[in-house]
Amino acid sequence: MSTAAAPSFLRQLFAGEIASDLLFPYPPPLDRRDPEEAETVRRLCAALNAMAASGVVDSRRFDEQEQVDEGAIRAFAEAGLLGISIPRAYGGLGLSATGYARVFGAVAAVDPSLAVLVGVHCGLGGKAIVLYGSEALKQRYLPALARGETLGAYALTEPETGSDAANIVTRAERDPEGRGWLLTGRKHWIGNGHRAGVLVTFAQTPVERDGATVLRPTAFVIRPDFPGFQVAGTIRKLGIRGSTQAELVFDRMLVPDDHVLGEVGKGFRVAVHALNAGRLSLAAGCAAAGKRLLGEFTRYAEARVQFGAPLASFEVTQRKMATIAAETYATDAMVGALASALENPAVDASLEAACAKVFASEMAWRTADELVQLAGGRGYVQPWPYERYLRDARIQRIFEGANEVLRLFVGLNGVQGPAAELQELAQALRRPLQHLGTLTGYAAERVASALGQRAGLEVPLHPVLRPHGEAFERQAAELAAAAADAVMTHRREVVHRQLVVERLADLAMELYARACTLARTQQLIGERGIGACGHEVALAELFCAQSARRFRTVHRELTGQGGATVDRLRLAVAAAVRSQGGYLPADALLDVPLPSPPAWGLSREAQEAAVGLVPAPSPEVAPER
């Protein structure tokens, strides 16, 4: 049976194959691959630490002022931190994905708001021009972005279109005078949007497909001095308050033809590839946050004495400490593997990027939540920083694609391989003599599955890791079988069975995290010897054991009757709640109507009133010079 043509560890895992060569051997540290780049990364990290020590970067100040001040941005520009993803040919540092991820993690550890600013500037806006810009666009805009003379932005999200990026409503039509494109629409939550001098945005354009005119997204490079561009205001937020998100208005904004990014009608490809880089950034930032927060967790637990002993001496605290450490180790392993995959243009790492983003963001949220819980009342109030950590962590599950949507993205893409195989099988069954080879191959696969034969890692693991490798192989086979069964059971309706697809994604995510963890730990053992890797082995063993247990729980829900029964009950209750607009039963103590919350109207005026747009300051950073 065939698998997806583009190499992808997860796509092949769904199809019952373990593409060991895509993860093993784990990529060596950067200083062994590129000593010169490693030295650059060290210099940048040292500059970041110096900025934090001197007060140039001050998370508390940024949070209270609700902006990153110009002094910090200038310091970043002077250090070269605004050109890390831009090739050297255009004045940047041209870091690899690995180097970029390491620097971005350091930025996130210093201040999450600055990480958002840098991520939007380098990882989204600048990266899209690097990947898809014409040579003229690159020459025109990348040097200024690399020097930090202006900031970059990435304007995709709209008031009515968040994760459903393919269905944006901003329209682009041809200018009657032939000067280019006229864009009309609004963009929401645009990081750096109020002071960026170069922005990448998206609009629906009419294109010909199969003899009919249809609307497809196109990417454009725009500037705030284009006629029709307006910043409606900036937005106050729960967390990452130092970063600024703006609402932009395009009122028949004129964009020249030479500012189309990529091809007309193929903007979705631009968005997806830029978001892969953005998801790497986010995962790297969350991994760094996990390391920093674990340090704070440990220090507080050792210092805080209750019942005559430090909190760190209690088993419940130690359980939390160990789980945070193991999950951070796994996240770090995923970031290293993903960065290496994104450096290989022949590899499709879109599913892996989505999994890393989901896993990392949820790890960071749990870690921040546990730190607040550990600190008790101090975790909830200022001037202690713990409540800010929690507020800053919350957005990660929404940025770069909401986690619920990314789970569906992973699950639905994963079942495409089994679906194609089963479609091929169905055709063979209609004409069995003409497709004897297909039937024989499918029968052989089923017989092998029944006999317990399965794809293997095909790499030597140290004996201490081997049991976890064998568990991985068993559960990889279970994922492939569950994906095939889901397609056979639900057929075309599988795309609507989101609870099933979500579980498949959770299984895949656990396996990917575990494979990365095993690969990295095996690499460390090979380099240092088992005697020098005791802590890493303990982390890997703990993570693999906990991950395998989570896998078994989800797999039982997916393949047993219990999960289907619970799903039916959930959908029935949800239907009743929807029909009544909320909670139905009478109050158990005394049935007294609750006060109604303020109405959230759906009109544009009501939304703006609810959000409370703040008039945007005049940009202090000039656009194109």
Segments and roles (model prediction):
Residues T170-E173:
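A structural signal for short hydrophobic beta-strand segments in well-ordered beta-sheet cores
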